[in-house]
Amino acid sequence: MIPLQHGLILAAILFVLGLTGLLIRRNLLFMLISLEVMINAAALAFVVAGSYWGQADGQVMYILAITLAAAEASIGLALLLQLYRRRHTLDIDTVSEMRG
């Protein structure tokens, strides 16, 4: 069994990597992928904590997080596809100059 500290450290490292990718990248697709990494890191923390305390709540929260991530990814990819069809770019600087 993996110690609680090791699992939480791994989850924290994954979360920081996702946050770094979200803040540094200028491509909306890579920003969406970084957000998915952050959601999975939080879900991993739930599973590790639930496993440590012998509760099934961690796995239930993981299933909920996966469902949320799937919905977020499908809506985000649909929006990105439409944005790419209209603007022919996914660069955040170009997209932020859109007129209303």
UniProtKB/Swiss-Prot annotation:
Keywords: Cell inner membrane, Cell membrane, Membrane, NAD, Quinone, Translocase, Transmembrane, Transmembrane helix, Transport, Ubiquinone. It catalyses: a quinone + NADH + 5 H(+)(in) = a quinol + NAD(+) + 4 H(+)(out). The keyword Transport applies. InterPro entries: NADH_UbQ_OxRdtase_chain4L/K, NUOK/Mnh_C1-like. It is found in: Cell inner membrane. Gene3D superfamilies: 1.10.287.3510. The chain crosses the membrane at residues 4-24, 28-48, 60-80. NCBIfam families: PRK05715.1-1, PRK05715.1-2. The gene is nuoK. It is an enzyme of class 7 (translocase). Its EC number is 7.1.1.-. GO terms for molecular function: NADH:ubiquinone reductase (non-electrogenic) activity; quinone binding. NDH-1 shuttles electrons from NADH, via FMN and iron-sulfur (Fe-S) centers, to quinones in the respiratory chain. The immediate electron acceptor for the enzyme in this species is believed to be ubiquinone. Couples the redox reaction to proton translocation (for every two electrons transferred, four hydrogen ions are translocated across the cytoplasmic membrane), and thus conserves the redox energy in a proton gradient. It comes from Yersinia pestis. One of its GO terms (cellular component) is plasma membrane. GO terms for biological process: ATP synthesis coupled electron transport. This is NADH-quinone oxidoreductase subunit K. It is a multi-pass membrane protein.
